[in-house]
């Protein structure tokens, strides 16, 4: 069977890099299996398990969100969290939970920053309008 290159990255670094005849991914539209010669595709990676058929056996990688890019017989995965299933421990699970909480807080901060920025712009317009009205009265 023909092989193709797969690289899986997480914030911690490269989780897997190598050639394989087959890899299956959890996506937001279900499980997709990629074989050599697959069409070019970019799709969202869902939480779940990536299954890689390797020469030394099946490898399973647990992932939590991200993106998959398939271009010219190369598969690149960027995951928010990724680890070999046999490496999963309480510590890794705690890290994933902490990361999710951190992302949630950052999103709240972003929304709050957006609200603050909008309020500042509105206040600047109000101030400018008020100064123009005051000048006209003088």
UniProtKB/Swiss-Prot annotation:
Gene3D superfamilies from the UniProt entry: F0F1 ATP synthase delta/epsilon subunit, N-terminal
Primary localization class, coarse: membrane
GO cellular component, one term: plasma membrane
Keyword DNA damage: no
InterPro entries the UniProt entry points to: ATP_synth_F1_dsu/esu, ATP_synth_F1_dsu/esu_N, ATPsynth_dsu/esu_N
Record Pfam families: ATP-synt_DE_N (PF02823)
Cell location: Cell inner membrane
Membrane-topology annotation of the record: Peripheral membrane protein
Keyword Lipid biosynthesis belongs to the record: no
Entry keywords, A to Z: ATP synthesis, Cell inner membrane, Cell membrane, CF(1), Hydrogen ion transport, Ion transport, Membrane, Transport
Gene Ontology MF: a single term: ATP binding
Top-level taxon of origin: Bacteria
Subunit structure: F-type ATPases have 2 components, CF(1) - the catalytic core - and CF(0) - the membrane proton channel. CF(1) has five subunits: alpha(3), beta(3), gamma(1), delta(1), epsilon(1). CF(0) has three main subunits: a, b and c.
UniProt similarity note: Belongs to the ATPase epsilon chain family.
Role summary: Produces ATP from ADP in the presence of a proton gradient across the membrane.
Protein name per its UniProtKB record: ATP synthase epsilon chain
């Amino acid at each position: 069977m023909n092989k193709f290159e797969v690289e899986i990255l997480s914030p911690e670094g490269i989780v897997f890099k190598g050639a394989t005849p087959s890899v299956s991914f959890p996506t937001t539209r279900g499980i997709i299996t990629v074989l050599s010669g697959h069409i070019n595709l970019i799709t969202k990676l869902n939480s779940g398990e990536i299954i890689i058929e390797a020469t030394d056996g099946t490898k399973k990688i647990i992932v939590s969100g991200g993106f998959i890019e398939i271009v010219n017989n190369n598969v690149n995965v960027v995951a928010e969290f990724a680890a070999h299933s046999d490496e999963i421990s309480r510590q890794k699970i705690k890290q994933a939970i902490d990361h999710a909480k951190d992302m949630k807080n950052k999103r709240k901060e972003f929304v709050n920053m957006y609200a603050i920025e909008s309020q500042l712009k509105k206040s600047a317009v109000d101030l400018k309008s008020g100064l123009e009205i005051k000048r006209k009265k003088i």
